[in-house]
From Swiss-Prot:
Keywords: Ribonucleoprotein, Ribosomal protein, RNA-binding, rRNA-binding
Region ranges (Disordered): 100-160
UniProt keyword tRNA processing, yes or no: no
Official protein name in the record: Small ribosomal subunit protein bS6
Biased composition (Basic and acidic residues): 106-116, 136-160
Family of this protein: Belongs to the bacterial ribosomal protein bS6 family.
Length: 160
């Protein structure tokens, strides 16, 4: 039988338990028709890129399916009739990867606790250092002028 990966998005106001019940319903439908679920990942409640049926968030679920095309067609028809399911995307794959998907790997990467650090190296206040950074004293200006004059003298000596 061909292998498929299917991602479905359930509505925001559906609980995690109801999403798991939905997946069990899918598994029952597949088993009745000789198929099976080989992989199951709950990605959790995530923001949608755009509104879908007046929802801004949804519960994402990735399923690795082993079933016939007719069973898949019936599964997608049933999910289309279910009001709790916003979207379904199913792709045929050569093999189902047993490792966690990249979405779960990114979610659990080792960022750790940041404490109170909010990022950036700038001081807390916007005008703390004044406009244009710290002011240079007249002594600093003289030093820069002296360097410039030394560079000019070197260039002149090198040209001769």
């Amino acid at each position: 039988m061909p292998l498929y990966e299917s991602v479905l998005i359930a509505r925001n106001d559906v609980s995690q338990a109801q999403v798991e019940t939905l997946v069990e319903t899918i598994e029952t439908l597949l088993k009745d028709n000789g198929g099976s679920i080989q992989k199951r990942e709950f990605w959790g409640l995530r923001s949608l890129a755009y509104r879908i049926k007046k929802n801004r968030k949804g519960h994402y679920v990735l399923l690795g399916l082993d079933c016939t095309p007719d069973t898949l067609r019936e599964l997608e028809r049933q999910l289309g009739l279910n009001e709790d399911v916003l979207r379904v995307l199913t792709l045929r794959v050569d093999e189902i990867d047993e490792n966690p998907s990249s979405v779960l790997a990114r979610k659990s990467d080792d960022r750790g606790d940041r404490g109170n650090f909010r990022g950036g190296s700038k001081p807390a206040g916007r005008f703390e250092s004044g406009r244009g950074g710290p002011r240079r004293s007249s002594e600093d200006r003289e030093e820069y002028r002296a360097r410039g004059e030394q560079d000019d003298a070197r260039e002149t000596a090198g040209a001769e």
